[in-house]
From Swiss-Prot:
Record gene name: eccE3
Pfam assignment, any one: EccE
Function summary: Part of the ESX-3 specialized secretion system, which is important for iron and zinc uptake or homeostasis.
Highest taxon of the lineage: Bacteria
Lineage: Bacteria, Bacillati, Actinomycetota, Actinomycetes, Mycobacteriales
Organism: Mycobacterium tuberculosis (strain ATCC 25618 / H37Rv)
UniProt-recorded name of the protein: ESX-3 secretion system protein EccE3
Length: 331
């Protein structure tokens, strides 16, 4: 089934009206010039409103040109106003196997430090090895008072590390293994010499990575297990949580995933609820990297009780036992 794209934006509608209204006012069409204008208007309507597999023709053209312009992977932009720190989460000491997403979400605003987003990312391999990280992205503008109280030089990275250590301590108190994560402990999503194609990133004839946006709706608790059940060498899944604009009680959520396979990705989504990032895999995978300071696409108001209904995979025992002391930061 060919998915229908979102409702056209104002700019797209305005351009169509600029082409259609003069032709409509010229009715009845009698001269050759009138019919030429009619043809131009029809072409504009088809070009701006036409779509294929959920993407407007103009979006397809723009992404195709972007692939040609990209000679290498997009580097994370340098910034001194945003930083991301990571906490690894290991298996719990008790019988519980449900990651406390509601508790983790409370660290969006905890101990006077406000996070722009909190992201839970899991990587599961074909052998069943599972690793999970919780990323906190902190923005300087949202924490000026807290930063100035600590130092006159605005120690953004140190402040974010404090939040990460407190989250790790809290998780350990309730029975989970946890600690701050070092940059070299995060596996690469894509090899540096991979080449972007329309359907994914190609490293070799038997190594492809495809990115997908996941619909963050009421069906998300069913979508995530369906993604994990797909055959793949690696499955990356991320859930990002943020406060809704102007609120400190309502959440927005976004989700994304990436599948590493030894075959070329198909042209359609492998699971209902996924939107392939055709022609946009480099930006999507760059944002999906657990160390990224970028937000995931597609933030929407969180359905009621979504976090309590989501079952996040439990990391395998021993996967994170290496002593880690440094927090990840992209500044």
């Amino acid at each position: 089934m060919n998915p229908i794209p979102s409702w056209p934006g104002r700019g797209r509608v305005t351009l169509v009206l600029l082409a259609v209204v003069p032709v409509a006012l010229a009715y009845p069409w009698q001269s050759t010039r009138d019919y030429v204008l009619l043809g131009v208007a029809a072409a504009v309507v088809i070009g701006l409103f036409g779509f294929w597999r959920g993407l407007y023709f103009t979006t397809i053209a723009r992404r195709g040109l972007a692939i040609l312009r990209r000679r290498r992977r997009i580097a994370e932009p340098a910034t001194c106003t945003r930083t991301t720190v990571l906490v690894w989460v290991g298996p719990p000491a008790s019988d519980t196997n449900v990651l406390p997403l509601t508790l983790i979400a409370r660290y969006l605003d905890r101990y006077g430090i406000r996070a722009d987003t909190i992201r839970i990312t899991s990587r599961v391999t074909a052998s069943g090895d599972c690793r999970t990280w919780v990323g906190l992205t902190v923005v300087a503008d949202d924490n000026l008072a807290a930063l100035q109280a600590r130092s006159a030089r605005i120690p953004l990275q140190e402040t974010a590390q404090v939040a990460a250590r407190r989250l790790a301590d809290h998780l350990r108190e309730i029975g989970w293994e946890a600690g701050t994560a070092a940059p070299d402990e995060i596996p690469a999503l894509v090899a540096a010499d991979s080449r972007e194609t329309w359907r994914g990133m190609r490293h070799t004839d038997s190594d492809y990575v495809a990115a997908y946006r996941v619909s963050a709706n009421a069906e998300l608790p069913d979508t995530l297990p369906a993604i994990r059940s797909r055959p793949a060498q690696e499955t990356w899944i991320a859930l990002e949580i943020a406060y809704a604009a102007g609120s400190s009680t309502r959440y927005t959520v976004a989700a994304a995933c990436a599948l590493r396979t030894d075959w070329r990705p198909g042209g359609t989504a492998p699971v209902a609820g996924l939107l392939p990032q055709h022609g946009n895999h480099v930006p999507a995978l760059t944002a999906l990297d657990p160390r990224s300071t970028r937000r995931l696409d597609g933030h929407t108001d969180a359905p009621a009780d979504l976090l309590t209904r989501l079952h996040w995979p439990t990391p395998t025992a021993g996967a994170h036992r290496a002593p880690l002391t440094n927090a990840v930061s992209r500044t």
